[in-house]
Amino acid sequence: MIQVQSRLNVADNSGARLVQCIKVVGGSRRRYASVGDIIVVAVKDALPTSVIKKGSVEKAVIVRVSKEYRRVDGTYIRFDDNACVVIDANGNPKGKRIFGPVARELRDMDFTKIVSLAPEVL
């Protein structure tokens, strides 16, 4: 579960390395976000040559969470870290590559571009 002030790794090559959640999109009192949810993030660490600079505000979709969550079939899954992918206004990733595994739930939430770029879907 991701909430405001949570820090996440960036799982793409957009240039951002570490981001901090500043808003969970979807309702004025929504507190938590999980896999497939869109959040607004502030870039805390970025490569100096990247288009995305430190301090910029971007939208991102969560692809991995450390907290285990229940799937529809009754199984539970968790990852080693909290990670997100920076997206544009249309929901497409800003980077051209995705690093590490991503959750299968992204396919059902119309993030097929992220799923197709990912090396492993769990």
From Swiss-Prot:
Domain of life of the source: Bacteria
An MF annotation (GO) of this entry: structural constituent of ribosome
Pfam families: Ribosomal_L14
Gene Ontology biological process terms from the UniProt entry: translation
InterPro entries: Ribosomal_uL14, Ribosomal_uL14_bac-type, Ribosomal_uL14_CS, Ribosomal_uL14_sf
Keywords, comma-separated and alphabetical: Ribonucleoprotein, Ribosomal protein, RNA-binding, rRNA-binding
Paired cysteines (S-S): none
Gene Ontology annotations for the cellular component aspect, listed alphabetically: cytosolic large ribosomal subunit
Protein task: Binds to 23S rRNA. Forms part of two intersubunit bridges in the 70S ribosome.
Annotated HAMAP family: Ribosomal_uL14
Subunit: Part of the 50S ribosomal subunit. Forms a cluster with proteins L3 and L19. In the 70S ribosome, L14 and L19 interact and together make contacts with the 16S rRNA in bridges B5 and B8. Interacts with ribosomal silencing factor RsfS, which may inhibit ribosomal subunit association.
Protein family (similarity comment): Belongs to the universal ribosomal protein uL14 family.
Name of the protein in question: Large ribosomal subunit protein uL14
Organism listed in the record: Treponema pallidum (strain Nichols)
